[in-house]
Amino acid sequence: MDIYYKKDNCTLALGDTFEVIEKIKSESIDMIFADPPYFLSNDGFSNSGGKVVSVNKGDWDKISSFEEKHNFNREWIRKAKRVLKPNGTIWISGTLHNIYSVGMALEQEGFKILNNITWQKTNPAPNLSCRYFTHSTETILWARKADKYARHYYNYDLMKEINNGKQMKDVWTGPLTKISEKWAGKHPTQKPEYLLERIILASTEKGGYVLDPFVGSGTTGVVAKRLGRKFVGIDFKEEYLDIAKRRLEVVINNEKETK
């Protein structure tokens, strides 16, 4: 494992997630957020800024068979389970291309799925083929270890408070990532900060440890740090870790200026 960046309880590790997770202490993580490969890179096309573009994100997003995809998901979820605290939870984001494998893998590896969150995007990319409905949602599975004595943390009162005094439902509506959040560089699947803010507030307390095994541009870390959580992020692409590092530096420097 190569520590790419470490500062103020924020760590970015460069390497293969399967190998790096092995270095993390057992039952030390309060919450995991993962946005694993969607396996969309099949030489198809999408829309970006009104232009037709390839959906190929790189070799990391390609796979040859369902078995390979499912084995991949089972392996990283199995390793993630070891580092999760007994009362910890895991959130996994995906689309129809991978989420069914993820859900099955969670149950096969000893997790209980708590919620099936639907993130409804208010400004999705248009459907260029006109052969099916526009893809405007992503699914986020929330799960805990399937131990009947486990009592996962959920900040019910806060979720109700930020939802105008009503119980928070499992359909969350909002826009794609703002341009202002992409200033540090490009990443094909960068999540909006408001999404991670809700997830982290719902399932962790201040001072808790958050892990993102596919950290990408670092949104999970940026929000975790801003909310007073400790953070570990892993990625095998140095160019993405550089984006995450630059974003984390801004949050850390802003905190120092306000003290």
Model regions: which residues?
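Core catalytic lobe of class I
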Residues: 1-242
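Short, conserved SAM-binding/catalytic segment
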Residues: 2-7, 245-259
